């Protein structure tokens, strides 16, 4: 009798076990398998067997993650508008000066970061409204819109950290006062990037280094 009862219960228990693709989430980022995957040729691409990782925190909570993405998007849009007005009325003296906003690396990188947060929020909202199968882990192939957000992540994360290093290491003079705009665009940007990297489940691949390098080369050519 006990054997029959156990057989009838086991299927119910198995239904509640996570699928195989979710079990690999428990693999730590310090494991040998993780580092092997980092340097496989396939890691140059944008395919990933767990698209649901792009829709949640490290510990899950996809709905709260949507709120986080909304706050990040609103904050960065507000900041880029405010900093634009501050630049317009603080150092520009002619219409030609106002156009120069677009030639500065800081402004480009912050605009890129803002675009990334907006794309994240829209992609995640689409997943919650239309593609709930992605959030639940029901698919194992990356949709195009998540690939786009992944590229924007790579570009904005690297660009923000680079701008912070260049400003504080080579541009800013010790003892000189720092404006609110400079502090937000050269410190707040990297603070957000590091925080987001720590709490978001979105994977990072070292072999995606060529993406920000391509943008850097393009900027150098056109600003030379």
Model features per residue range: what roles?
Residues 2-224:
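Aromatic-rich, lipid-facing transmembrane alpha helices and their immediate juxtamembrane interface loops
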């Amino acid at each position: 009798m006990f054997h029959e009862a156990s057989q009838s219960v086991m299927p119910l228990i198995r239904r509640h076990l996570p699928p195989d693709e979710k079990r690999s989430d428990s693999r730590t980022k310090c494991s040998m398998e993780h580092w092997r995957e980092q340097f496989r040729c396939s890691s140059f691409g944008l395919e990933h067997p767990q698209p649901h990782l792009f829709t949640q925190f490290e510990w899950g909570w996809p709905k709260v993650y949507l709120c986080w993405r909304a706050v990040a998007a609103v904050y960065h849009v507000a900041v880029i508008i405010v900093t634009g007005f501050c630049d317009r009325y603080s150092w520009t003296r002619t219409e030609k000066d106002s156009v120069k906003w677009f030639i500065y690396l800081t402004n480009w990188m912050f605009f890129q970061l803002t675009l990334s947060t907006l794309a994240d929020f829209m992609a995640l909202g689409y997943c919650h409204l239309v593609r709930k199968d992605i959030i639940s882990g029901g698919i194992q192939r990356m949709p195009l819109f998540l690939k786009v957000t992944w590229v924007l992540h790579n570009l904005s994360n690297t660009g923000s950290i680079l701008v912070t290093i260049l400003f504080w290491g080579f541009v800013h003079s010790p003892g000189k006062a720092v404006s609110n705009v400079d502090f937000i665009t050269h410190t707040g940007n990297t603070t957000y990037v590091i925080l987001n990297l720590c709490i978001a489940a979105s994977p990072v691949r070292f072999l995606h280094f060529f993406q920000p390098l391509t943008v850097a080369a393009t900027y150098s050519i056109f600003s030379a």
